[in-house]
């Protein structure tokens, strides 16, 4: 058995937890409507939610993920001008994620990350999510950036787990073979299946 030198973390449900905070979610909905110039917040969010369903079906069926601009231009607000969408797409995606809950590092997560790094492991994040900027901003703001040697996001590479290529990309960026890496995640169908297919 190979000695483990690298560890990949999933985010949602593993390293980060979403908490239902009504005031936080309502503020995100208001900001989205403001950015879009929509006078009726509830009607606007109902429309976005309805349009998100076929996007989600496509993403799960095809193991693909759209970047911020494509998400809004093709799926959620296709009637809006290109210039407007390019201006607001990143914040719209961020706020839509906030509308789904307030996220924070799982209890004990920082201690685990620090402990592994101190023992010489190379660390990476491999996650399926919409939003190109949120995770990089979060890592900077919470001063976690120095602990991670690579971050592979479906919204940036445009493929989703269980596609093993996400894990192969992570291994290449760590400079390690898949057999030298481990994956910490919560979803058997997406995370564990993808990692095993990549020989992690």
Spans of model-derived segments:
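Substrate-recognition/cap helix-loop segment adjacent to the acidic, metal-dependent catalytic center
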Residues: 110-124, 129-152
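Surface-exposed amphipathic alpha-helices with a cationic face
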Residues: 113-120, 171, 192, 196
């Amino acid at each position: 058995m190979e000695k483990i030198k690298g560890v990949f973390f999933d985010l949602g449900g593993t390293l980060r937890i979403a908490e239902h905070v009504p005031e936080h979610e309502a503020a995100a909905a208001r900001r989205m409507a403001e950015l879009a110039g929509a006078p009726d917040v509830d009607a606007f969010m109902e429309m976005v939610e309805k349009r998100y369903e076929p996007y989600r079906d496509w993403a799960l069926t095809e193991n693909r993920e759209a970047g911020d601009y494509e998400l809004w231009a093709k799926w959620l607000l296709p009637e809006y001008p290109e210039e407007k969408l390019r201006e607001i797409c990143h914040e719209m995606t961020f706020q839509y994620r906030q509308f789904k809950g307030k996220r924070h590092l799982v209890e004990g997560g920082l201690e685990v990350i620090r402990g592994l790094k101190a023992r010489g492991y190379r660390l990476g994040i491999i996650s399926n999510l919409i939003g190109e900027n949120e995770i990089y901003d979060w890592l900077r703001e919470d001063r976690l950036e120095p602990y991670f040697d690579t971050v592979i996001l479906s919204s940036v590479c445009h493929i989703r787990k269980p596609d093993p290529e996400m894990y192969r990309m992570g291994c290449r960026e760590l400079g390690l073979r898949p057999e030298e890496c481990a994956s910490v995640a919560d979803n058997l169908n997406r995370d564990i299946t993808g990692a095993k297919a990549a020989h992690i």
